[in-house]
Design a protein with these regions (language model features):
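C-terminal lobe and pocket-closing loops
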Residues: 97, 269-279, 292-403
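Short, well-ordered beta-strand elements
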Residues: 26-37, 59-64, 86-87, 135, ...
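Short, solvent-exposed loop/beta-turn-alpha elements that line the ligand-binding surface or hinge
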Residues: 108-120, 162, 190, 207-228, ...
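Hinge/lid segment of periplasmic solute-binding proteins
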Residues: 92-145, 154, 170-172, 196-202, ...
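Extracytoplasmic "Venus flytrap"/periplasmic binding protein-like
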Residues: 47, 51-121, 127-129, 154-157, ...
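Glycine-centered hinge/linker elements that transmit conformational signals in sensory
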Residues: 172-175, 214-245, 287
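Conserved C-terminal helix/tail region of periplasmic/extracytoplasmic solute-binding proteins
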Residues: 154, 365, 376-440
Length: 440
């Protein structure tokens, strides 16, 4: 009898050990890169990861922050080494770099699945479509509005209502400029950096100007671009001194300080107005446009792309798909948008935009009118080089990386060139990098 009991116990122990080993072998450990370094953004990512792991105990996920300044270098190095993260949060320019190095898996199946379930905004998936495949899954997006301080408009213009067209835009900027009291009408940059490209392109959307035509030919040098640059130049005189060197941080600090009354910018200072100033004196509307122009703005969809080596790691591709499905659930996606950075990131699906969790966020609800304006503006927003629902020029990553649009602006506002000469220069520079896809 004792021998029988001993034998049974031995068998049970062996079975338990085998089961435990088998369980451990089934745990998939995913690693991904993203570029959102502020502590509250990292915390939002971790909250999502913790919730995911609670529902998927056999999948462990690790986030790694790679600063934007290092993103291209580290991505290229990982591709050359043939090993890196399972997936990466990115923007179209960086995705295109990985695509051109033949490092990506198409994600058409998961994009179509999510589109059917949650309904992607068309302009959010357009930057990722090429040769009948999607190469990135949009997760969240960013959009420019005309941000402003209502109290300053009331004081200097006599109304808290923002300008409705470019004529009023210039009138407001002039009236709002009071150097003796350290108040200026506008906050736009003049340096050679990405923010200036973002601001300048927003004006281009209002005139209908583009980098390329539908076949990918460079068409930058045209009257619509010149009209946009003229408006930028005319507004620039109402900047604070030193705006030539500004980037994102200076816009945010100066609109908080009440030094600038208006700025075409992401409505992303909500968290600071709420938590640091406890102020409602911050608003935003769709960017004004000229007579004969149209509504428009820049949007930056942020996506996930997946590397080929992920499919070679047992279980990793399936686990990555599970993670993507999880974060696209509207009851989870609000953590990636409203919680990560209210006003900085917005949902890319109709379902997530309508989710009660998003609108119940205390900061989103405090600045609800501004956030509804952002959601509405996405319908008319686009990204330079990606306006046609597919890739038309594979040189767009190099063109934006070279800050050609920003340098056009710099040459204009610094007085180094006439608008016509600067636009012609920019057109010729774009031609050097241009790789038209053609009408495929």
């Amino acid at each position: 009898m004792k021998k029988s009991i001993f034998f049974i116990m031995t068998v049970l122990i062996v079975v338990t050990l085998v089961f435990s080993i088998s369980y451990c072998e089934k745990v998939v450990e995913l690693t991904f890169w993203h570029h959102e370094a502020p502590a509250h953004r990292v915390a939002a990512f971790q909250e999502v990861i913790d919730l995911f792991e609670a529902e998927h105990p056999n999948i462990k996920v690790t986030q790694e922050v790679v600063m934007w300044g290092d993103a291209w270098i580290k991505t290229i190095a990982a591709i050359e080494a043939g090993s890196g993260p399972d997936f990466q949060f990115s923007i179209p320019d960086l995705l295109l770099t990985s695509y051109l190095l033949d490092a990506l898996l198409p994600v058409t199946d998961i994009v179509e699945e999510l589109d059917k379930e949650y309904d992607f905004i068309d302009s959010m998936i357009a930057p990722y479509f090429h040769e009948e495949e999607y190469w990135g899954v949009p997760i969240m997006t960013m959009v420019f509005l005309l941000t402003y301080r209502p109290s300053l408009l009331e004081k200097y213009v006599g109304t808290s209502e923002p300008p409705k067209n470019w004529e009023e835009y210039l009138e407001y900027a002039k009236k709002l400029t009071d150097p003796k009291n350290n108040v200026y009408g506008i906050g736009i940059g003049g340096g050679i950096n990405l923010m200036i490209s973002e601001q300048a392109y927003t004006f281009m959307t209002n005139t209908g100007a583009k980098f390329f035509d539908e076949e990918g030919n460079v068409i930058f040098n045209n009257p619509k671009t010149i009209q946009a640059m003229e408006m930028y130049r005319d507004l620039f005189q109402y900047n604070p001194p030193g705006a030539e060197a500004w980037s994102w941080g200076e816009i945010e600090l100066n609109i908080m300080a009440g030094k600038i009354a208006m700025a075409p910018y992401f409505p992303s200072v909500q968290r600071r107005f709420d938590m640091e100033l406890d102020s409602d004196d911050y608003a935003a509307v769709a960017h004004p446009f000229p007579a004969g122009g149209k509504p428009g703005s820049i949007t930056y969809p942020n996506e996930i792309h997946i590397y080929k080596w992920t499919a070679e790691r047992p279980g990793h591709l399936e686990a990555t798909y599970d993670f993507i499905r999880f974060i696209m659930r509207p009851d989870i996606n609000y953590l990636m948008t409203a919680v990560q950075e209210p006003g900085g990131f917005y949902p890319v699906t109709v379902a997530a935009q309508e989710a009660p969790e998003f609108w119940a966020d205390p900061i989103i609800s405090r600045y609800e009118e501004m956030n509804r304006a952002a959601i509405e503006a996405l319908a008319d927003a686009s990204l330079y080089g990606f306006e046609y629902g597919r890739w038309v020029n594979l040189g767009i990553g190099d063109i934006t990386g070279a800050n050609i649009l920003a340098e056009v602006v710099n040459r204009i506002v610094a007085g180094g060139m006439t608008i016509e000469d600067a636009v012609e220069w920019g057109h010729n520079e774009m031609e050097k990098y241009s790789v038209p896809v053609g009408n495929k």
